[in-house]
């Protein structure tokens, strides 16, 4: 099957009745196609529609090909200020947007993100855009944290040398972070996320562990924490594009290297190595820039 679910490109043709797009438009594509008549879609939760057809999810092919056919309602024109590379990164950024939306951040809140991979970084960006005054981002790989240098409002925490909960507590007079995002997918993280959160705060489960995890419910109850989960995203793609087009979000810094389509196997092999110095490896189809 064809892989790939993060894409941007150029419109070649449009069907009858499509008025917001024209051939030649540069676009980003939301990869999940729900059943518009499902209850989930009608309630605005189309991301959890059991019938959703999502790129590169068997048996549905992905977008790593020169041409795709995609519904116009899930195809968004890119502003001139965004490159094709940034357009393809709208998809992971939408995950961060969904997480920040579910957190219900208030202006000035302190946030913390566990995991400095792509999803962790875009979640931190979305939290800042959503009103957080600062975001602590922790990871056990210091190489990943180096990519955060120069990002205003982000405080890197090397988890191999420093305890996240203790650092946040020290900087907040013992109160904690109003929003904690678990974005690593590591089951062990659920052993301490409640310690990082402030009383009345929220823990948002973003990363997806490979199996069941242990979570101290009593610790969460003692602080009256709110627990939120996300699955992909819904109704945030246009907002994600608008934010990325401004000055507050820099998605281009996530791209480690771009290689041509004929070197795709090399890209996937390198991705499987999980080098801590790699954030996003992109594959370019001829004609994109």
Annotated model-derived regions:
Residues 191-195, 234, 238-289:
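C-terminal hydrophobic helical "lid"/dimerization subdomain
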Residues 33-114:
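NAD(P)H dinucleotide-binding glycine-rich loop of Rossmann-like/cofactor-binding domains
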């Amino acid at each position: 099957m064809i892989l790939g679910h993060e894409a941007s490109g150029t419109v070649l043709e449009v069907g009858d009745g499509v008025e917001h797009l024209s051939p030649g438009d540069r676009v980003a594509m939301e990869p999940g196609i729900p059943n518009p008549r499902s209850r989930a879609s009608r309630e605005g939760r189309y991301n959890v529609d059991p019938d959703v057809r999502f790129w590169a999810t068997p048996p549905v092919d992905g977008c790593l090909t020169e041409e795709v056919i995609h519904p116009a309602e899930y195809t968004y024109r890119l502003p001139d200020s965004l490159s094709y590379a940034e357009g393809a990164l709208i998809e992971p950024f939408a995950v961060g947007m969904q997480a920040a939306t579910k957190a219900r951040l208030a202006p000035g809140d302190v946030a913390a993100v566990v995991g400095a991979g792509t999803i962790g970084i875009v979640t931190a960006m979305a939290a800042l855009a959503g009103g957080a005054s600062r975001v602590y981002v922790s990871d056990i790989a210091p190489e990943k944290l180096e990519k955060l240098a120069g990002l205003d409002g982000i405080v890197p925490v090397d988890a191999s040398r420093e305890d996240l909960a203790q650092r946040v507590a020290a900087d907040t007079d013992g109160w904690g972070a109003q929003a904690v995002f678990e974005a690593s997918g590591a089951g062990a993280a659920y052993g301490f996320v409640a310690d990082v959160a402030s009383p009345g705060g929220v823990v948002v489960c973003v990363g997806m562990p490979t199996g069941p995890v242990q979570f101290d419910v009593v610790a969460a109850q003692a602080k009256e924490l709110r627990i939120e989960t996300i699955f992909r995203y819904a109704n945030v793609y246009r907002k994600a594009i608008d934010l990325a087009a401004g000055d507050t979000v820099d998605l281009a810094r996530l791209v480690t290297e771009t290689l041509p389509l004929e070197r795709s196997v090399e890209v996937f092999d390198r991705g499987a190595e999980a080098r801590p110095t790699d954030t996003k490896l992109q594959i370019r189809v001829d004609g994109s820039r």
